[in-house]
UniProtKB/Swiss-Prot annotation:
InterPro entries: Homeodomain-like_sf, Recombinase_CS, Resolv_N, Resolvase-like_N_sf, Resolvase_HTH_dom, SSR_resolvase. Residues 2-135 form the Resolvase/invertase-type recombinase catalytic domain. The gene is hin. A DNA fragment of approximately 900 base pairs, adjacent to the fljB (H2) gene, which specifies the synthesis of phase-2 flagellin, can exist in either orientation with respect to fljB. The orientation of the inversion region controls expression of fljB. The hin gene occupies about two-thirds of the inversion region; it is required for the inversion of the fljB controlling region. Keywords: DNA integration, DNA invertase, DNA recombination, DNA-binding. Belongs to the site-specific recombinase resolvase family. This is DNA-invertase hin. PANTHER family: DNA-INVERTASE FROM LAMBDOID PROPHAGE (PTHR30461), SERINE RECOMBINASE PINE-RELATED (PTHR30461:SF2). One of its GO terms (molecular function) is DNA binding. GO terms for biological process: DNA integration; DNA recombination. PROSITE patterns: RECOMBINASES_1, RECOMBINASES_2, RECOMBINASES_3.
Amino acid sequence: MATIGYIRVSTIDQNIDLQRNALTSANCDRIFEDRISGKIANRPGLKRALKYVNKGDTLVVWKLDRLGRSVKNLVALISELHERGAHFHSLTDSIDTSSAMGRFFFHVMSALAEMERELIVERTLAGLAAARAQGRLGGRPRAINKHEQEQISRLLEKGHPRQQLAIIFGIGVSTLYRYFPASRIKKRMN
């Protein structure tokens, strides 16, 4: 049962001594480090630390925000450790998932992360509904407006080639096929 430390500083200029001293005092057998922003998901030091952790081991950080910036990421990382039979310990936040209280705190964090996701979905849906009520549509603007659609439809019915119409209207041939499938034009011509 090893104790693995993880250090992260956001910039090369930041000093890691405070974190290293704390992890050394916590009797970490091995310490991994990153000098990279917590917003960056791809952290080589953290990846090596997680590979090194085995069942019964504990991953130790000086402070919770050294491991991740969002509750969602923290929950995912700690869940991964839990699934592998490993523990997590944050020294300054007094979180230790090897204890009942630490596991309870982790479950509260998980619930908060889920609630945060649900609130984001609710706000997004409410915003889209409000925009629709004001006549705004979401998504990319249409490539061609109604008037242009009517013009193109008439020209296609007269037999003008799609490639030529695409150049004239400044759109792709695939856009023309999306608006005017070949089967629809043939039906109109018959």
